[in-house]
Amino acid sequence: MDPRTLMTRPTVAVLYKYVPQYRRRFFELLSDRLTERDVELILVYGDPGPEDVGKGDAVELPWATKVPNVTITVAGRTLYWQRALKVLHGADLVIVEQASKLLINYALLALQTAGRTRLALWGHGVNLKQEEASRLGEALKRAVSRRAAWWFAYTDATAALVRGFGYPAERITVVQNAIDTRELTVERERLTTTETGREEVAALRRRLGLFGHNVGLFVGAMYEQKRLPFLLEACVRIRELVPDFEMVFVGGGPDKPLVERAAAAHPWIHAVGPVFDEARVPYFLLADLVLMPGLVGLGILDCFALEVPMVTTAVHYHSPEIAYLDDGVNGMMLSAACSPAQFAEAAAALLHDAERADRLRAGCRQARSRYTVEEMVERFADGVTKALDVQGLAQ
């Protein structure tokens, strides 16, 4: 008898600090896909820490296992110990977030050295916010990265960084990080094709007091790396170049007072506050462009889903998903050195060029079909299968 017929199906554990809303659908689909491949998924997670709790985006997954997260502050930095070793015992592959502050990663690496499990990393490769990065933390991250049994890289750019550590390319899976935007596209369809939907959008326009037909939109958290002072200065210049230009800000955060003061001074600037999920869709339908001169992350996928091109700059601290923006095809990427006036001139030129704007919207539609959570799940499941194959465990 083949000894493998006596084996139980292989088990893969994913250890996550906490589960944000945008990851729920991914984990649900991944569990289903791995079950189809005769692989058991164990998801282990905790509560958000002090730097995340204010986001209000944590969700509970009844089918997963929740463990306590213990936080320790050392030299002003928050470190985490996740009480998960007992739950992870016996897993053939443990996938963790690549973060030097997650202390359990070092314990799991020791268990891998002892032949007790295999450790895979999932992440960015480096801390893209270099001004916040710890030199020791980044050195530890590189050392651990080279010793992982497998790597799940967010994007092609992440994979290139990991290869730069000396990690073998054949053990890297590019997962093409994405979120589920189906609800956004369904809501867009409803709002644009039904009489009641169109009236809802018109009512929002009246409620905001939008009189112009050239509208910019900012959606997201408001903090330093979003460059709101830069954007507000640029908006004033756009208004000079495009007299009916209006700007809508959706979101909250420590820099929200900057936007509120600008809105008080300029009636064509509208400060809305936080709006989530499909409730954001009508704001996109009122907009011609998303203006985001600072950090861009998964929000680029909202622009693709809702067919509103983004204008941004090539700052060095973008999240990996900025790789999905193809300058001149599905959005616009300006120099990191551009001034607010130059940013404004580029945005105004696009508002005046309907043909070019239509091409960018078509590019958004194409990108929408490429960067999907379903594709991410398939790539991730392929990586899991390959990692288990290395151990001779995939069935």
Predicted regions and their residues:
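Conserved donor-binding/catalytic core segment of Leloir-type glycosyltransferases
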Residues: 13, 192, 198-199, 203-226, ...
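A conserved mid-protein helix/loop that constitutes part of the nucleotide-sugar donor-binding site
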Residues: 24-28, 214-237, 247, 254-257, ...
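A short, histidine- and acid-enriched strand-loop-helix "catalytic/donor-clamping" loop
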Residues: 103, 117-135, 147-150
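Donor nucleotide-sugar binding/catalytic pocket of nucleotide-sugar-dependent glycosyltransferases
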Residues: 142-203, 210-211
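A short, well-ordered alpha-helix in the C-terminal region of glycosyltransferases
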Residues: 239, 342, 349, 356-370
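Acidic donor-binding loop of glycosyltransferase active sites
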Residues: 285-298, 308-309
